[in-house]
């Protein structure tokens, strides 16, 4: 199939789909790190203090040393990470003195909404609790991208850019680095194993991951208006707030949100997992959200973290240590066995994207692979160009070949297909030095999920 026809087929498949996304959008301030940037950062501190703090592995950034220690750890291991920052004026001022290279849309709901609007699916309804003018302007200017408001007691869908309020702005600082970046720490030369990113995530006290009551009562109506929902941002929930509300309160509301969305129409829902440093919050995402959705997307570290919560410590540690595909597939099967609500577990890594389903899934293995192939093209396009601004950009992603391990990975995955499970794998189209890695996982997951729902709908209608 020629490139133009292949892209046309993919876009034609998804064009009738309607999507709801929530909850997290923010402004990403991005710094593309060079060798000298990191060297300058580590030289601000005693190198032995950095090493000691790395061993302590801080789960919240309370001072600049915590940040430098976790950044170095991320570079050294080649693993992406997201760590919340304490809401402290002096600490924010320290980060503000860094010269960032650009600002762009951040947050899974924001990134996915912009992508799907650009790909011209039929309708996207996005909800985020904060929508300042600056945030609203970071959404792409398309008529298919809408925000739910209540006016005179009625649900109204407005273009996102016209729906802004006088809300605070949530800013995440993103530190991107490329494979091969080098610096010295205490006499040791450290080299970045992979191109990835480290996120310093702000958690403003005023930000609550919830749908406000006025819109919330219309969730059954919103659910009726869409085919599927892509849900994310739960990592921003705090254990406790100054007004006495707790994580349990917000997770109970979030669980109810899913039920309300499905009240009038049995839509497909997807949880996009994330790097969650707080183990209690991670457990609540599993207990309240994972147990209520049909689809979940995660990377290998995230599936390992979920398996740890479920008590599979040895398998979890093996995945964290070696990332063998056999262990990842075994972990995905465990999730399907534990959570009967799940139809599909999707795992994305640098080298592949994987679907693990039960054998009775209505889509064939070839159709599942088609979903994954579409998502790899989206990912390679975004990695190469930094962003997807038009459908024609996908031709750039399609030019990038699958990585050299593709045949071996497909061969291994094929061995796990049996009477109980259906497994599909697509090797990634590997961009050696990506322009940007932020949002790659969200791009992969949303592409695969929306395509999956589109094929299910077509199958049902035929």
UniProtKB/Swiss-Prot annotation:
Protein's UniProt name: Bifunctional ADP-specific glucokinase/phosphofructokinase
Keywords: Cytoplasm, Glycolysis, Kinase, Magnesium, Metal-binding, Multifunctional enzyme, Transferase
Any single GO BP term: carbohydrate metabolic process
Catalyzed reactions per annotation: D-glucose + ADP = D-glucose 6-phosphate + AMP + H(+); beta-D-fructose 6-phosphate + ADP = beta-D-fructose 1,6-bisphosphate + AMP + H(+)
UniProt key word Aminoacyl-tRNA synthetase: no
Record: active site: 442 (proton acceptor)
Lineage start: Archaea, Methanobacteriati, Methanobacteriota, Methanomada group, Methanococci
GO molecular function: ADP-specific glucokinase activity; ADP-specific phosphofructokinase activity; magnesium ion binding; phosphofructokinase activity
SUPFAM superfamilies cross-referenced by the UniProt entry: Ribokinase-like
UniProt pathway: Carbohydrate degradation; glycolysis
Residues holding Mg(2+): 272, 302, 442
Annotated family: Belongs to the carbohydrate kinase PfkC family.
Subunit structure of this chain's protein: Monomer.
pH dependence: Optimum pH is 6.5.
Coiled coil ranges: none
GO CC field: cytoplasm
Record-linked NCBIfam families: P_fruct_ADP (TIGR02045)
Ranges of residues in domain ADPK: 1-458
């Amino acid at each position: 199939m020629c490139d133009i026809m292949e892209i046309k087929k993919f876009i034609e498949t998804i064009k009738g789909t309607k999507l709801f996304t929530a909850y997290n959008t923010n402004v990403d301030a991005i710094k593309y790190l060079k060798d000298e940037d990191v060297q300058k950062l580590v030289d601000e501190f005693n190198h032995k203090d950095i090493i000691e703090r790395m061993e302590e592995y801080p789960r919240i950034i309370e001072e600049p040393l915590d940040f430098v220690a976790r950044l170095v750890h991320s570079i050294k291991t080649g693993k992406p990470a997201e760590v919340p920052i304490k809401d402290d004026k002096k600490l924010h001022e320290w980060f503000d003195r860094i010269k960032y290279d650009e600002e762009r849309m951040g947050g899974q709901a924001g990134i996915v909404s912009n992508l799907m609007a650009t790909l011209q699916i039929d309708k996207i309804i996005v909800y985020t609790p904060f929508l300042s003018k600056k945030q609203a302007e970071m959404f792409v200017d398309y008529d298919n991208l809408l925000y739910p408001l209540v006016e005179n007691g009625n649900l109204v869908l407005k273009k996102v850019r016209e729906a802004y309020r006088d809300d605070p702005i949530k800013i995440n600082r993103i530190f991107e680095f490329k494979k091969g970046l080098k610096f010295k720490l205490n006499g040791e030369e450290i080299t970045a194993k992979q191109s990835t990113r480290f996120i310093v995530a702000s958690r403003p006290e005023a930000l609550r991951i919830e749908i406000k009551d006025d819109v919330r009562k219309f969730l059954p109506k919103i659910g009726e208006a869409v085919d599927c929902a892509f849900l994310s941002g739960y990592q921003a929930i705090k254990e406790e707030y100054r007004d006495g509300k707790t994580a349990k309160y917000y997770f109970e509301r979030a669980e109810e949100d899913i039920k309300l969305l499905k009240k009038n129409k049995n839509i497909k829902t997807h949880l996009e997992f994330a790097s969650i440093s707080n183990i209690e919050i991670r457990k609540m995402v599993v207990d309240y959200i994972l147990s209520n959705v049909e689809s979940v997307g995660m990377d290998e570290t995230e599936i390992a973290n979920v398996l740890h919560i479920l008590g599979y410590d040895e398998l979890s540690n093996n995945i964290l240590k070696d990332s063998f595909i056999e262990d990842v597939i075994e972990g995905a099967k465990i999730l399907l066995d534990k959570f009967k609500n799940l139809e599909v577990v999707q795992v994305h890594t640098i080298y592949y994207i994987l679907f693990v389903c039960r054998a009775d899934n209505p889509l064939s293995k070839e159709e599942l692979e088609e979903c994954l192939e579409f998502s790899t093209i989206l990912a390679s396009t975004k990695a190469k160009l930094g962003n997807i601004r038009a459908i024609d950009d996908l031709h750039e992603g399609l030019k990038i070949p699958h990585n050299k391990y593709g045949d071996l990975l497909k061969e291994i995955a094929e061995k796990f297909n049996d009477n109980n499970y259906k497994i599909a794998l697509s090797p990634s189209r590997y961009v050696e030095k990506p322009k940007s890695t932020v949002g790659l996982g969200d791009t992969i997951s949303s592409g695969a999920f929306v395509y999956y729902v589109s094929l299910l709908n077509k199958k049902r209608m035929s």
